[in-house]
């Protein structure tokens, strides 16, 4: 029953689908195992949060700041991360199937072992990212890992 706030503990919470959390500040929140499928979390501050093993199917993170957030093994199938700051996010082992990262900042993101089948990275900054196969993307990588 905790309201959205910085450092809130929503570990393993199961929210109603299509929840509107646009513009919230959840910096440092504990959300491991949370279910926010189909939620609208656009234009939000979710930096330094723990969202590992969470369910974010079709969740909208458009224009959000997720700097240094842990999304290890999260299910982000068809999620929208367009124009978001994802620098230093840990997507290790995450399901990013058909997710969109158009114009997103993925500087030094960790995608080791992630499923990126069908994901869209148009105009995304991939400089310094650790790619799904463990190689490091060159500085200046945009849209593809060079």
Task: Put a short name on every predicted segment.
Residues 1-146:
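Tandem repeat scaffolds
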């Amino acid at each position: 029953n905790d309201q959205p706030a910085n450092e809130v503990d929503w570990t393993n919470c199961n929210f109603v689908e299509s929840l509107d959390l646009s513009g919230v500040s959840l910096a440092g929140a504990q959300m491991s195992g949370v279910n926010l499928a189909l939620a609208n979390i656009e234009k939000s501050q979710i930096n330094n949060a723990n969202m590992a093993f969470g369910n974010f199917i079709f969740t909208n993170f458009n224009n959000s700041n997720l700097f240094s957030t842990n999304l290890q093994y999260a299910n982000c199938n068809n999620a929208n991360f367009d124009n978001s700051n994802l620098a230093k996010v840990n997507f290790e082992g995450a399901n990013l199937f058909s997710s969109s990262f158009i114009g997103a900042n993925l500087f030094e993101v960790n995608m080791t072992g992630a499923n990126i089948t069908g994901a869209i990275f148009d105009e995304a900054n991939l400089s310094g990212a650790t790619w799904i196969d463990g190689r490091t993307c060159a500085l200046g990588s945009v849209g593809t890992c060079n």
